Amino acid sequence: MSGAVATLAPSRAPLRHSGADKPLLRFITCGSVDDGKSTLIGRLLYDADLAADDMLATLESDSRKHGTQGEELDFALLVDGLAAEREQGITIDVAYRYFATDKRKFIVADTPGHEQYTRNMAVGASTADVAILLVDARKGILPQTRRHSVITSMFGVRHVVVAVNKMDLVDYSEEVFRKIEQDFRDFAKHLRFTSIYVAPMVAKDGDNLVHGSTKMPWHKGPPLLTYLEGVAVEDTTRIAPFRYPVQWVNRPNLDFRGFSGFISGGNIRPGDIVRILPAGRDTRVARVVTYDGDLESGVSGQSVTLTLAEEIDVSRGDMLCSPVSPAKVGDRLEAQVLWLVREPLVVDKTYLLKIGAKITAATISTVNARIEIETGLAAPLEPGATLQFNEIGEASLSLETMIACDPFIDNRETGGFILIDRITNETAAVGMVKTVASSLGRSAPTLTDLSYASMEGVAAPAAANAPATISLGKTLAFAAAGGVATFGVVAAFGQNASLAAQIALAETGALAVLHYVFEKFWRAPQTPAAPTDETPPFTGEGL
């Protein structure tokens, strides 16, 4: 065994350090318990000469202590790093591994299959481009397989590999493989996968992982690693509208005030106009600052500090975005929710909602539907319904404050949130924004919107009561004119300004009352215009 380890060393070193200018692919392994997820990753790294010498030496030692493969190496131990994982032979936490081939860089997340660790699987899915869904050829599609499929689709993973593992235990049967393939395709037709690749394999033997299978000649597709190197995944955040959630107000001294964060979409240059949400004010970017100096531009995926041309109030949790395609602003959300704790969701209970760096109180007002794991479809629920542990539903949320966000389908970074129990501080749920609305009746109110609304609020009542308003104005003007005239006469002839003021005030009050009575009761009201059957001209109001 040690000799085999030594021969792998020369070819591994350049591979591990040769990924500087290559495209990056993030993928996860998921599926039901004991389907071989960790074994698949460990064997893939081993066969591709991507496991370092010290890792292999540790693997030999751990295989003797905790291995489940007899005298053979237990490749799952290359990935399962926690003591509890090694002792129990299961995956508990998400394990990340980084490697590169001649064609691509990879970050793989090995996620647990046990039901109680679904929250950890969701963490891995939240950033993945591709999901490798392990299926035991003997058992077929299980409930946890379906649940993980729904979760990966929910988190925006668009490419899935169905790895039908342990084919040696069904005598490499094509019939068994085809049935599992058809079962999954029938189930997944309602999910939002762009591509589904189904491949047979034996992970512990490395069959169809790096090299094509010699025992299943009926399978014509590429081995797993070849597929991963070639799958086309678009980075839509680079062409998306600019999004910049502010994580920190950077004020190291009196001469510098910047706003630090992660560019979640688009790009930014000095001189670009940005909109600050939820306030809705526009300003101009002065500098794009990093530790290594100023940049000519910042792009999606970079952490930078932006300075603005004006001294404007911007706080942690605010968002700087494109004024042409701004994020939505609102305090009402429709969202998909994955419930993560044993205690059921409580309707009308207040939780903390965290989206980016923004934290606000949120109440789940209704649970509108539950995703049925057997079908992947949403089933409507009665009012007052709730969600149990690991259930997925569609819910309506009311927020305490306005937030800026996007539908999750448009931007993962600005459309995903978590709900935190205010008593236990547990992460109770993870959610994906579907739609955003405002209790003010608009989907994205800004300062400009609110100023117009306030003007309309004053102008509309005044217009509706125009005759009364005009009458009152005439009354006050008439009375004031009389009072001023009386003051002038008395002051000039009586030489007593104090007495003149008292007489003028008394006269002003009396004249106001008399004139108002005249306008209100003696003057004939205007005859309203006769109704007409003509349709008023279209103005576009209300669109």
Language-model segments: residues:
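Conserved Switch II/interswitch segment of TRAFAC-class P-loop GTPases
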Residues: 104-106, 111-117, 125-149, 153-178
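Conserved nucleotide-binding/hydrolysis micro-motifs of P-loop NTPases
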Residues: 35, 46-47, 114-115, 138-142, ...
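P-loop NTPase switch module centered on the Walker A-proximal segment
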Residues: 10-116, 128
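Juxtamembrane/disordered regions of integral membrane proteins
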Residues: 441-543
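Canonical P-loop GTPase G-domain recognition
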Residues: 170-236
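Accessory interdomain/linker segments of ATP-dependent helicases and helicase-like nucleic-acid enzymes
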Residues: 204, 221-257, 275, 282, ...
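Active-site phosphate-binding and catalytic loops of NTP-dependent enzymes
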Residues: 66-69, 80-92, 187-196, 229-242, ...
